[in-house]
Amino acid sequence: RQDQKGVLLGIYEVNHEHWAMDGAPWDYGMELFQEQVDRIENEITLGFERYPCLQEVGVKTWVNGAFTFSPDGNPLMGPVPGKPGYWCACAVMAGFLQGGGVGKSLAEWMIEGEPEADVYGMDVARYGKFAENKEYIRQTTGQFYSRRFVMTYPNEQLPAGRPLKMSPAHDAMSAAGCKWGVNWDLEVPLYFANKGFEETPSLRRSNAFEIVQRECLMVRDGIGLLDISGFSRFEVTGQNAEQWLNKVFASKLPKPGKSALAPMLSPTGRLKGDLSIFNWGDGTWWIMGSYYLRAWHMRWFLDQIAEGVGIRDLGEDYCGFSLAGPKSREVISQLSEGSVEELPFMGCGNFDIGLVRTKVGRLSVAGELGYEINCKMGDHIALRQILIEKGAEFGIHEYGFNALLSMRLEKSFGIWSAEFTQGYTPGMTGMDRWIDWDKGDFI
């Protein structure tokens, strides 16, 4: 761009170099570094070819300074999980462009309790402790920097910082043709394809479209199996657990052996989350939601925590599978040592599925007849094998989250952070139908 009577040429080089990975010195301010022309030779040559006049005039000033980046290039702001009273506003890459909005939102957050705008994409709690790993930071920030002017297509999966965490059945699912994406720190199934298939990213429908279409039809007309390790799970216990849940959630709490959809609101009545509550009937409750919101939800839960209430993130302990489709009841009825097939819609309970002790909910994000079957991490491989072997005679096939997301949209199941944000009220999303207006005080 023009810079007074000259031209300013900016470069994001592929051969980037990290600096101060342990943190910048406290006395560092606006200092510049010695130029390293050899490192940007390819990029500057392209610039000279694009603007031939630059080849004749020479370089007046070299500017080599530090940039601050997060793994996805967005700022890191807000209250830091696990550190009460500690706030941050870091990784503001474009200070002049973003600084005003970051400052405004942070001030509103501190004074009013929440920012006016939806700032989840900049919230420090969009990451978990896995992102504190220096190698993860090095890979992901380097990837973002080097791709600053590279087209990233919808649903394109990038390699940096992964694979990091995998469900126990990962290898068996890979052998079955699973193509993987990443959800927070976890590898999740996107779809299942023939050996050798490679997706070509596109601004239109990619060459994986027909594969995902087949998976949708399979679940609609028959039966499908989905790894739901990519759901979050929180356990709530204690003598005041029910009272606490009744305050934190706007819905009516489920009776023992039942589950319920539960909107969670901010003090101003805006949507804080859409989750499911399970009452297992033994004094323990589960909250289930989106896996990538684990730190975000836990921060809110701990902000509201009360005496006599314990809450635990089960994300490292539990995983599971979802059976969905009109034939799912036939399969599960032949495997359970209980009346799991008689569970009413939104019912839940503890059942033995083959050799595996499970916690089952009769619901499905796909919108079809379905069962969410939760198990301990150590039972994941065995549970998959049991379900596939028994489901074979019914034509069972595995499917991925691309199909699940498509089916939930067709069913009009919107979710927080995708279709809905913290700028929405329950009335704007249709979730007001789950609010219990007659119960006592709630947030």
Show the residue positions of the predicted features:
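Active-site lining segments that contact anionic ligands and/or coordinate catalytic metals
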Residues: 4-6, 72-74, 83-84, 368-370, ...
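Glycine/proline-enriched, intrinsically flexible loops and inter-domain linkers
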Residues: 117-443
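Short, surface-exposed charged micro-motifs
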Residues: 1, 76, 274-276
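General beta-strand recognition
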Residues: 8, 76, 85-88, 286, ...
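Glycine-rich, aromatic-lined ligand/substrate-binding cores of catalytic
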Residues: 1-14
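C-terminal catalytic lobe of FAD-dependent flavoproteins
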Residues: 4, 18-19, 25-165
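Short conserved micro-motifs at the rims of enzyme active sites and ligand-binding pockets
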Residues: 11-12, 20-21, 420
